[in-house]
Each structure stands twice: as C-alpha cells, then as structure tokens.
Amino acid sequence: MKKIFLAGLAAGFQTTWTLGKVIFPVTLLVTLLQHTPVMDWLVRLITPVMGLFGLSGEAAIPLVLGNMLNLYAGIAGILTLDLSVKEVFILAVMLSFCHNLIIESTVAAKVGIRIGVILAVRIGLAAVSAIVINLIWHGGKETAQYGFIAAKSAAPDSWLGMLAEALTKAGLGVLQLAAIVIPLMIIIQFLRDLGWLYRFSRWLSPFTQLLGMNKNTSMTMVTGLTIGLAYGAGVMIKAVEDDGVSKRDMTLAFIFLVACHAVVEDTLVFIPLGIPVWPLLLIRVTTAVLLTMAIAHTWKKWKPSAVGKEAI
C-alpha cells in the first residue's frame, strides 16, 4: 500500500509540475496583458461572435487557451477575468466538451478515428450547448468568486504592482491545481494497481452494449472515463489492439468519450471557479449517452452488414 501511495504521490507531483508549467506562465501573461491595449483590441474584435454564446468578448481568451493547450490553461484564463456565474458556467460547459484539441485529436487518429469527425463533434457540442444554455437560463448574473482568488481590488498603478498581482494569481492557480491533482493521482494509482479498473471494465460491459457497442469496448471506455484521452492514450491504444475492438465501436466509444471523459478530474477542476459542478457533469453524461445511442442506431440502420466486422 505504501508503494502504491508513493507512486501515486509521485505521479501527482509530476502531473502538477507538468501542468503547472502551463498554468503559471499563462496566468501571468494573461493577467499582464489585461493592462495593455492588446486585450482591449482583441475583445472588440471578437465580441460580436461571442455574443451568440451569451459571453463577453474577453471570454474568448480562455476558450482559445483551453482548445489550443488544455483545460487547465483555459481555467487559468478564466481566473484572470471578471465574469458572471452564468458566463463561467457556459465557458465550463464549452471547455468540458472542447479542449486540448491538438493532443486529443492526435490520440483519436492513432486508433483510426478521423480527426475531422472528432473536431466536428467537439466544436459542435460546445457551440450548441452554449447557445441553448444562454437561451434557457436567465439567472447567474452575479459575479463569480474564484476560490482562493479574492474579489478584484483597485487596479495597480505601477508595473511593479501589476507584476505582483500577476505573480499572486499565477501562484494561487498552481496551488489550486496541486490541491486537486495530487489526491486524484493517488486515487487513480490505487485503482490501477489494485485491479479496480479491470473490475470497472467488467461492470461497464452492459452499459457499453446499451450504447450500441460490443462489450470488448469496455476497457477503452473505463480508461477514458477515469483517466482521460490524453493521459490514458497509451492504455486505450493497447486496449484497442488487445481486445480487437472494431472500427465502428472505436468510433462510437470516442464520440462518447470526447463528450464525457476524465469525469472526476474534469469536473473537480471547475470547483474553484465557483460554479455548480453537478449540473455540469449531468450535461456531459446525458449528452454523451444520447448522442452515442443516436449515432449507433443510425449507423446500424444505414450499414447493417458492416456492424462488428471491421477491425483496426
């Protein structure tokens, strides 16, 4: 048990270090840019487009960071902005569906999934969900409170003050990251080394069949749901090869997982943003289930002779 704990602790610190190298400079840079004309110019340029999603122009900053880098970079961008609870929730939903596009799309390509399909699903889900939430939710107008980040005080009047503000926000962002990631990595290490991931795989078999996939897809699903697409890439690729998962089932699995993966981590990381995370999780799971079942049904209806025959 001690070895497992230490291995998980080491993985937690390693992950914190890796992601902290993104969180710290991104938070520092974006905070400093807020005091320059660059941010105002960018906001004016994209405000009309962001209005479709019920967001202010500056909300595009975390969207770009999250999609080009990762979810943590997007959250770092949010931490530097004064947004309403509704805006933060919409951003959280969009980023939960659509983040880390470069790396996670590459993972999809490695198991034979068309990158265009994955991008279309993720970007489409993010856009549609934002528009729907903006239309049906009329609350959440109060300013969001960001965990350790205190309410904004008077703007600093010197470059030294600006730098101090940026360093403080960047440091607190890394501390919040460590408080979430380290315990999470320890738990995942125990699950992996004690064989619980394989047990979850067996338990998940009926669910994968309900979604229209064969039960040999369950290990891939468990890995994606618990670890995520980026961190679980190696395990998922090996599971596809070892279990003989068909191209159809792999495509369906990835469609589900791009909408709902790393359900523990990608939900908990939003807690410091001061938004309700249970509705966020419910939206992800419900969307993933309904979308996957609909595509599986349509695929079976259009190509009944191909189901289960193609292998990667």
Curated annotation (Swiss-Prot):
The chain crosses the membrane at residues 4-24, 45-65, 75-95, 117-137, 171-191, 217-237, 253-275, 280-299. InterPro entries: Gate_dom. It is found in: Cell membrane. This is Uncharacterized membrane protein YvoD. Its main location: membrane. It comes from the Bacteria. Keywords: Cell membrane, Membrane, Transmembrane, Transmembrane helix. The keyword Membrane applies. GO terms for cellular component: plasma membrane. It comes from Bacillus subtilis (strain 168). The keyword Membrane applies.
